[in-house]
Amino acid sequence: MSYCRQEGKDRIIFVTKEDHETPSSAELVADDPNDPYEEHGLILPNGNINWNCPCLGGMASGPCGEQFKSAFSCFHYSTEEIKGSDCVDQFRAMQECMQKYPDLYPQEDEDEEEEREKKPAEQAEETAPIEATATKEEEGSS
């Protein structure tokens, strides 16, 4: 016997093996092709920003959402030669807001940043002698 149970926001449906093997008779509702927020990504067809895009990771709706929207909008619509150079104040306001919520917007530690900068330099040092040796060998064989 099949039955359904609601637990908070979840709806749990229990079915028998026979119910599960029977083809579904559910009718799918076609998506509204005029829905401006459906499957368009970050930029809507009209050029506006889709603040509901999952690609923004919820930044537009967090405690600094208004500051994020202001900075992002300024950058998106910027017509300066160096895009976004006219948005320093908006980005500064967003950064100040984010610093008030370090648990939600973790700052990159200076130590982590230095480590990341050192790694490419160390890798370049490791490969440099190999490349130099290969060049000398090529010159000797010519």
Curated annotation (Swiss-Prot):
Chief location: mitochondrion
UniProt keyword annotation of Amino-acid biosynthesis present: no
InterPro entries recorded: CHCH, CHCHD4
Protein name: Mitochondrial intermembrane space import and assembly protein 40
Domain (CHCH): residue spans on this chain: 61-105
Endpoints of the signal sequence: none
Result, substituting C53S: Does not strongly affect import and stability of CHCHD4 in mitochondria. No effect on disulfide exchange with substrate proteins. Does not affect interaction with COA7. No effect on interaction with AIFM1
PROSITE patterns: CHCH
Posttranslational mods: Forms intrachain disulfide bridges, but exists in different redox states.
GO MF, one annotated term: protein-disulfide reductase activity
Biased composition (Acidic residues): 106-115
Quaternary structure note: Monomer. Can form homooligomers. Interacts with GFER and forms transient disulfide bonds with GFER. Interacts with MICU1. Interacts with COX19 forming transient intermolecular disulfide bridges. Interacts with COA7 through transient intermolecular disulfide bonds. Interacts with AIFM1; the interaction increases in presence of NADH. Interacts with NDUFB10; assists NDUFB10 oxidation, folding and import into mitochondrion.
Keyword Nucleus listed: no
Main function: Central component of a redox-sensitive mitochondrial intermembrane space import machinery which is required for the biogenesis of respiratory chain complexes. Functions as chaperone and catalyzes the formation of disulfide bonds in substrate proteins, such as COX17, COX19, MICU1 and COA7. Required for the import and folding of small cysteine-containing proteins (small Tim) in the mitochondrial intermembrane space (IMS). Required for the import of COA7 in the IMS. Precursor proteins to be imported into the IMS are translocated in their reduced form into the mitochondria.
Chain residue ranges for the region called Disordered: 101-142
Region (Sufficient for interaction with AIFM1): 1-27
GO annotations of cellular component type: mitochondrial intermembrane space; mitochondrion
Cysteine pairings via disulfide bonds: C53-C55, C64-C97, C74-C87
Sequence motif Cx9C motif 1, residues: 64-74
Tissue: Expressed in all tissues tested, suggesting an ubiquitous expression.
Free-text domain note: The CHCH domain contains a conserved twin Cys-X(9)-Cys motif which is required for import and stability of MIA40 in mitochondria.
Segments crossing the lipid bilayer: none
Motif Cx9C motif 2 boundaries: 87-97
Alphabetic keyword roster: Disulfide bond, Mitochondrion, Oxidoreductase, Protein transport, Redox-active center, Translocation, Transport
Subcellular localization(s) per the UniProt record: Mitochondrion intermembrane space
Originating species: Homo sapiens (Human)
GO biological process: mitochondrial disulfide relay system; mitochondrial respiratory chain complex assembly; protein import into mitochondrial intermembrane space
Lineage: Eukaryota, Metazoa, Chordata, Craniata, Vertebrata
